[in-house]
Structure formats: C-alpha cells, structure tokens
C-alpha cells in the first residue's frame, strides 16, 4: 500500500488545487476571453449597412379580419382579349366596306341617266363594283377574241389619275382618288353592253358607229351627272362630260377594233 501511495503522489502535482482552476476561468462576457484576441477587431454594429433600404422600412400592419378582405380591396374580373359576344361584331362585308344596297343604287343611277344622283352615296369610296365591271368588260372582250386585260386596267388607271387632277382644279371642295375611280368604274357598265354586242355583231358598220357613239354619250353623261351632284359643281356638267367622253371613247375603240 505504501508503494501505491507513492505512485499517486508522483502522478499528481502537490501544488495543484481547485482554487487555482477557479482563478483561471475565462470571462466570456468581457474582453479578456480567449476568442477576444482573434475577433476583437471586427465591429458587429456595422452589419446594418448591408441590409437594403426598402427592407428597413416599417411594414403597415394588417387591419382586416380573418377571412374578411379590407375595404380598399376591390376584386375585378379579368378582361378577355377577344370579345365573348360574336353577335355584337359587324358583318364581314361591312368591315370590308362592301354594301350591296349602295352598289345596287349606284348601278341604277348609271342605268337611268335622267335619275337624280344621291351625292352622299356617290361620294363613297367603293371599288368592289368597279372591279367587277372591269373584269366583266375584259371577259366580254375575251369572248370576242381580244385579250386586252392589260389595256383595260392601264387605261383605267391613267384616266382616273387625269380626272382626279382635273376635278381637284375645277371643284372647290376637292375629291379623293378613290371616289373618282369608283364613279368612273360604275359608269363603265354601258360599255360592257357594247362589248357584249361585239361578240355577236360587227360594230364596224354604220349601225355599230351609231351604237358606239350612243354608248359613249351614255357613259360620259352618267359620270358627269354623278360628279356634279357629289361635288356641288352646278353649271359645269359639259366641262366634266368632255374628258369623260374622251376616256370612254378609248374603251369603245378597244371594243370595236
């Protein structure tokens, strides 16, 4: 036993005591801790500079109740991109500017030269009827063995441009190019009758010359009457009818020869 006591005495230092351990305890709340030497230079008070400014603003408290929206919230239904009611949409022909009633009235005005023309209807830009009449005129020439579609459209374009310049110089209100093309195209309808006669009969005799002169006068008189009523050019019908007669005379020459 004496040997065991000597071993314990050698293992433990005689100067060690619990009081010494309490003196070596670290004060972690102060600046004398073991970690204060390594991180003493870092200032934690500057961490707020990395926070965005919008996050630092105080948020508005929610004043509503559970399952009840606030008074400022007004729910709205999303608006659809396309209309749900197709009945409110205008017809396709109306969107394209094709009115069969006005086309029929303009056609009757051309077929009845003595009928008073409606200036409000004739002042519209309607090219559906003139395109059909130009195609019909070219088709009747084709039945007679004359392929003249290029001449028909070319002469029509040049004639419309010339009448457009002339009417703008003569009238006080002015006129659009579409209106001039529409009126001249509708007044081409009697010329279709002349080209239809040329399919069956020859127009190079005396009867053909008289018929051709009558058709030219018919077309030019109808066109001048419509221009006078649409542009309020009273007393100038003969001045307008003369260039119209020159234009329709070219179409008559194509039909006869």
UniProtKB/Swiss-Prot annotation:
<keyword id="KW-0256">Endoplasmic reticulum</keyword>
<dbReference type="GO" id="GO:0060628">
    <property type="term" value="P:regulation of ER to Golgi vesicle-mediated transport"/>
</dbReference>
<dbReference type="GO" id="GO:0070971">
    <property type="term" value="C:endoplasmic reticulum exit site"/>
</dbReference>
<feature type="transmembrane region" description="Helical">
    <location>
        <begin position="174"/>
        <end position="194"/>
    </location>
</feature>
<protein>
    <recommendedName>
        <fullName>Protein YIPF5</fullName>
    </recommendedName>
</protein>
<comment type="subunit">
    <text>Interacts with the COPII coat components Sec23 (SEC23A and/or SEC23B) and Sec24 (SEC24A and/or SEC24B). Interacts with YIF1A. May interact with RAB1A. Interacts with YIPF3 and YIPF4.</text>
</comment>
<feature type="topological domain" description="Lumenal">
    <location>
        <position position="146"/>
    </location>
</feature>
<keyword id="KW-0653">Protein transport</keyword>
<feature type="topological domain" description="Cytoplasmic">
    <location>
        <begin position="1"/>
        <end position="124"/>
    </location>
</feature>
<comment type="similarity">
    <text>Belongs to the YIP1 family.</text>
</comment>
<dbReference type="GO" id="GO:0042175">
    <property type="term" value="C:nuclear outer membrane-endoplasmic reticulum membrane network"/>
</dbReference>
<keyword id="KW-0931">ER-Golgi transport</keyword>
<keyword id="KW-0813">Transport</keyword>
<dbReference type="Pfam" id="PF04893">
    <property type="entry name" value="Yip1"/>
</dbReference>
<feature type="topological domain" description="Cytoplasmic">
    <location>
        <begin position="168"/>
        <end position="173"/>
    </location>
</feature>
<dbReference type="GO" id="GO:0005789">
    <property type="term" value="C:endoplasmic reticulum membrane"/>
</dbReference>
<dbReference type="GO" id="GO:0015031">
    <property type="term" value="P:protein transport"/>
</dbReference>
<dbReference type="InterPro" id="IPR045231">
    <property type="entry name" value="Yip1/4-like"/>
</dbReference>
<dbReference type="GO" id="GO:0005802">
    <property type="term" value="C:trans-Golgi network"/>
</dbReference>
<keyword id="KW-0812">Transmembrane</keyword>
<keyword id="KW-0333">Golgi apparatus</keyword>
<dbReference type="GO" id="GO:0048280">
    <property type="term" value="P:vesicle fusion with Golgi apparatus"/>
</dbReference>
<feature type="transmembrane region" description="Helical">
    <location>
        <begin position="197"/>
        <end position="217"/>
    </location>
</feature>
<feature type="transmembrane region" description="Helical">
    <location>
        <begin position="147"/>
        <end position="167"/>
    </location>
</feature>
<feature type="region of interest" description="Interaction with Sec23">
    <location>
        <begin position="75"/>
        <end position="106"/>
    </location>
</feature>
<comment type="function">
    <text>Plays a role in transport between endoplasmic reticulum and Golgi. In pancreatic beta cells, required to transport proinsulin from endoplasmic reticulum into the Golgi.</text>
</comment>
<keyword id="KW-1133">Transmembrane helix</keyword>
<keyword id="KW-0968">Cytoplasmic vesicle</keyword>
<feature type="topological domain" description="Cytoplasmic">
    <location>
        <begin position="218"/>
        <end position="236"/>
    </location>
</feature>
<dbReference type="GO" id="GO:0005654">
    <property type="term" value="C:nucleoplasm"/>
</dbReference>
<dbReference type="GO" id="GO:0006888">
    <property type="term" value="P:endoplasmic reticulum to Golgi vesicle-mediated transport"/>
</dbReference>
<feature type="topological domain" description="Lumenal">
    <location>
        <begin position="195"/>
        <end position="196"/>
    </location>
</feature>
<feature type="transmembrane region" description="Helical">
    <location>
        <begin position="237"/>
        <end position="257"/>
    </location>
</feature>
<feature type="transmembrane region" description="Helical">
    <location>
        <begin position="125"/>
        <end position="145"/>
    </location>
</feature>
<dbReference type="GO" id="GO:0030070">
    <property type="term" value="P:insulin processing"/>
</dbReference>
<dbReference type="GO" id="GO:0030134">
    <property type="term" value="C:COPII-coated ER to Golgi transport vesicle"/>
</dbReference>
<keyword id="KW-0472">Membrane</keyword>
<dbReference type="InterPro" id="IPR006977">
    <property type="entry name" value="Yip1_dom"/>
</dbReference>
């Amino acid at each position: 036993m004496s040997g065991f006591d000597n071993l314990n005495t050698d293992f433990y230092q005689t100067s060690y005591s619990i009081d010494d351990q309490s003196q070596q305890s670290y004060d972690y709340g102060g600046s004398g801790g073991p970690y204060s030497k390594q991180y003493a230079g870092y200032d934690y008070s500057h961490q707020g500079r990395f926070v965005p400014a919008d996050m630092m603003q105080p948020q508005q408290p929610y004043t509503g109740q559970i399952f009840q929206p606030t008074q400022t919230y007004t729910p709205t239904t999303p608006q659809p991109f396309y209309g749900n009611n197709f009945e409110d949409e205008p017809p396709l022909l109306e969107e394209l500017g094709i009115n069969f009633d006005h086309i029929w009235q303009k056609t009757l005005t051309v077929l009845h030269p003595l009928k008073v023309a409606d200036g409000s209807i004739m002042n519209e830009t309607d090219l559906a009827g003139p395109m059909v009449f130009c195609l019909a005129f070219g088709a009747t020439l084709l039945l007679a063995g004359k392929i003249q579609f290029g001449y028909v459209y070319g002469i029509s374009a040049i004639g419309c441009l010339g009448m457009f310049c002339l009417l703008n110089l003569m009238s006080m209100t002015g006129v659009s190019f579409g209106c001039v093309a529409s009126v001249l195209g509708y007044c081409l309808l009697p010329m279709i009758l002349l080209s239809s006669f040329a399919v069956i009969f020859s127009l190079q005799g005396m009867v053909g010359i008289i018929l051709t002169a009558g058709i030219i006068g018919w077309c030019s008189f109808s066109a001048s009457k419509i221009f006078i009523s649409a542009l309020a050019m009273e007393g100038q019908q003969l001045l307008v009818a003369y260039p119209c007669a020159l234009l329709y005379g070219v179409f008559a020459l194509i039909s006869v020869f």
